[in-house]
From Swiss-Prot:
Protein name: Proline-rich protein 22
Source organism of the structure: Homo sapiens (Human)
Compositionally biased tracts (Basic residues): 383-400
InterPro entries named in the record: PRR22
Entry-linked Pfam families: PRR22 (PF15776)
Transmembrane segments: none
Domain of life of the organism encoding this protein: Eukaryota
Compositionally biased intervals (Basic and acidic residues): 413-422
Region (Disordered): 1-35, 306-325, 363-422
Cystine residue pairs: none
Length: 422
């Protein structure tokens, strides 16, 4: 492994055995920097990072579990395998070369070629046929990565499923496509469109079940439906059972047209009054609301007329039937009545108004003046109260009532309002 040292050995015989020769030998032993510098390369040869050139060319054997390719590279036979394919396309498709000699049992000792048929090889793309891990370098071998077989023609049918190949053979669709059929290389390209054609008719059969459930849920809840006639559905609810009789596979437009026609016919025929009675308006005009709560500025309607009109509440009413609407609220009878001539009702309404009038509560603490002072500012109070009706409950009616035993609290703010002009 080490280079010979021809320079150190002949030094002693040339000089002979003399003290000078010994000294010369010692001098030569101290001088040989170049000759003694050779052991470090010999020691460095053990280092894997700096192997000497002659050792690179000759390797004793590949590492355990690896095989050496003709290029000198080592590979794992469990991942890669050596195959040799003839460049001539006219000859047989695929060959495999075994080890020349020294192979384990099951591998022939002489180099030979195995003719592998492409169909069995493609149908069984299992692990490489090498049962061993270490093999002596043999004849001409090539390093190829071991991937799934190149021919995706027969294997492409496996992606469709177990019933994919059989269904493809039975369908007459591939013969119709005569353009790509005569070309032998693109059989996998032909196989891809038929699975799409097979799956397309199968897709409509699956969604109807899920769509029927969704359609049934939407039919029970007319709120989220985008149709523009929710009131008609309430009136023609009797015609709903006939809608699910149609198959769920129909388009939504047809179903909408059938529903619309059935609802229009049933609404004109029956037109139940109970539906109108149950249907309450969600929006009320501001004028009607102000008339309902007696807050309309400049309203000169008599108080008794509101209570005299009975009848059901209609959304088109302009205020004549508003008394019935306010009575539909869950409020005490004192607050639902407009007859302020009753002292109890007037007292209750005035107390409710003063809960929200914080100025009046703060200004009630000053001493109350005599009755003559309360009579003078009464008309001024009625005018100002009517001007600010949006913030207070029923102040206009309260100002018209004369000071009585039930209206003991109003004199406080009246005195203040009368004192403001001074």
């Amino acid at each position: 492994m080490q280079h010979p040292k021809p320079f150190c050995a002949p030094a002693a015989p040339q000089e002979g055995f003399s003290p000078q020769s010994l000294e010369g030998a010692e001098v030569l032993g101290n001088q040989p920097a170049p000759t003694c510098a050779e052991p470090p390369p010999a020691m460095g040869s053990l280092n894997l990072y700096h192997p000497p050139d002659p050792e690179k060319e000759v390797f004793p054997a590949p590492p355990a579990g690896f095989q050496m390719a003709p290029c000198g590279c080592f590979f794992d036979p469990r991942i890669y395998r050596i195959e040799w394919t003839t460049p001539d396309l006219g000859q047989s498709a695929l060959y495999k070369l075994a080890a020349s000699s020294g192979g384990p049992a099951g591998v022939p000792s002489a180099p030979g070629s195995y003719l592998l048929e492409p169909q069995p090889y493609l149908k069984a793309p299992g692990l490489p046929p090498y049962p061993h891990y270490q093999q002596a370098p043999g004849g001409p071998q090539f390093l190829l990565p071991y991937f799934p077989p190149e021919g995706p023609g027969p294997e492409a049918l496996g992606f469709v499923g177990d019933a994919g190949p059989a269904a493809f053979v039975e369908l007459p669709l591939p013969p119709l496509e005569e353009g790509p059929a005569p070309l032998p290389p693109p059989p996998p390209k032909e196989n891809k469109p038929p699975p799409v054609l097979i799956t397309l008719p199968a897709e409509p059969t699956l969604p109807p079940d899920a769509y029927s459930h969704l359609q049934g849920h939407l039919g029970h809840f007319p709120g989220p439906e985008p149709l523009a006639f929710p009131v008609k559905e309430l009136q023609g609810s009797g015609a709903r059972p006939g809608v699910p009789l149609y198959p769920p596979g129909l388009s939504e437009l047809k179903v909408a047209e059938v529903k619309e026609g059935a609802l229009l016919g049933a609404g004109k025929a029956k037109a139940p009054k109970t539906a109108r009675a149950l249907a309450l308006p969600d929006k009320v005009l501001l004028e009607d609301a102000m008339k309902l709560f007696d807050c309309l500025p400049g309203a000169s309607e008599p108080e008794g007329t509101l209570c005299e009109v009975p009848g059901p509440a209609l959304p088109d009413s302009s205020g004549g039937n508003s008394a019935d609407d306010i009575r539909s609220l869950c409020l005490p009878e004192e607050l639902l009545s407009f007859d302020y001539s009753v002292p109890e009702i007037l007292d209750t309404v005035s107390n409710v108004d003063y809960f929200f009038n914080f100025k009046a509560l703060d200004e009630e603490q000053p001493p109350h003046p005599g009755p003559p002072a309360t009579n003078t500012p009464a008309p001024i109070l009625s005018g100002k109260r009517k001007a600010s009706t949006a913030k207070k409950g029923k102040p206009g009616r309260k100002a018209r009532q004369p000071a009585g035993p039930a209206s003991a609290t109003p004199p406080g703010p009246r005195e203040d309002l009368g004192a403001t002009p001074h």
